[in-house]
Amino acid sequence: MIFRYFVLLLLLCSTQLNAQEYSMGANFNPSTIAATPQKIALSFRSFAAMPASYSLEQYCPTPGNQGKHGTCVAFANGYSIATILYAKTHNITDKAIIDKYVFSPTFLYEQIKSANDTDCQFGSDPITAIGAMIDLGEVFMNKVPYACGTLLPNAAKIEAKNYKVKDAAVLFAAKGMSVDDVYYKEPTDMINVTKKALTEGTPISGGFRLPESFFKIQSAVWTSDPNEVNKDWKHNGHAMAIVGYDDNVGGGSFRILNSWGNQWADKGYVWMRYQDFTRYCTLALQVFADPNTMPPEEKKPSPTPTPQPNPKPEETTFSLSGNIEFKLNTGSDMTVNKISTRNLTVEEDVKGAKEDLVAYTMNGIYPSGTRFRFYMNIDQEAYVYAFATDLTGKVNLILPFADNVSTHVGSNSTIAFPSDTKVIQLDEQKGTDYLLILYAAQKLDAKDIVAKMNGMQGALSTKIKAVLGNKLIDKSKITYDSDKVGFSSKGHSTRNLTVVEDSKTATTGSVVPLMVEIKHN
């Protein structure tokens, strides 16, 4: 009896020591989650052609080790995600170069930790961390090495502004983590939105509440114990980067980059089966790269190379392209025709109309009560916004339809409006309605645009040009489709993404407007 008790005690101690061997440190806060927009729901179409596997591992740094500190959030988001985005933006796949430019978890943690967290044990909020990366930026680890309690030099804070991430949106949050569970998704949807975000070329910031078996992994694929329950350890929450997936590993698994060193599990990574992911992932956020980060020395051209390189090094550019499909609820197409417009009045293409915007008109006139929806297809990463006018000329914002919705979407995505299962119905007020959709390479203040448009006189096209000004990409640099509402615009410098409001500034802009005239009787 004494022997059996002794063995049981040894097993219990072994389990506790195993758990204590690795630190965590993610604190999930429903209030910061609620203040972060959720990525808009994509159409079913967006998930139809996803590959069986996808990986960002070629852009990952060597797995870091947080040691005994509660700094997993800084490692998952600063060390891992910021570095992956930087390497992908500048097409760096050489692991030695990636490790040279790995970002500092200390720089991030020291700015977001509690004031009384002197020994870096209290942990931090993943959303606060990502917000700091967006607003303040990051610096390389060779400038601010990993250590607790480091006093950050002002020079590092200044340099960090050159290395920001662009944006982030919540993909989902577990039950109880958002008001009325508005950010909750069913397990199948959790898997699909995570896979889709990865195929858009973005790593995912994952927050987890992990069971004991995760701390005892001895293989590349984690197999959880179905009978175990979460333990209330010092830091129940853990943050890790999600960097890929494979439908054929373990019945379908996500590739996870951890911060417990490269001796843990599969050289610092682990495959987490979809069923475990949906059970233990508490929060997932898609993080987007800022294309304007300063390139590494290895990618910079010499100041005055002789002879001149041929071809010359290209600066970072962005492209926008997409189209809109209108469908009756019967499934039939609502066809359109491109028009040259002066204040959205149809007229033939003539010389001297280059200053006008391009618009489309429906070929048919539809009766009141007609039900339809439209699909916005986004070929390259973009922010999308939609506005509609009524018969009084008032402009209404219809997308995003709520403050907690992000319309920043990645490549090869489709948004159905109002949704795949809902339709728009033309009301009894006969006449002409106008729809305006903006594709933008930078975030716009949609509410401010509406307020300014409604505060001025004139037709819709006049208001667009007055409000957006030099943010609009020049019409001569846009190729518009003639038989569908669509366009392409390529090769613009990312420097235009930060152009100031100055009518004298020469710029190609970063916004493409698509206007559609809908007549009904």
Across the structure, where does each feature detected by a protein language model lie?
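Short, solvent-exposed loop/turn and secondary-structure capping segments
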Residues: 83-94, 143-145, 217-220, 253-255, ...
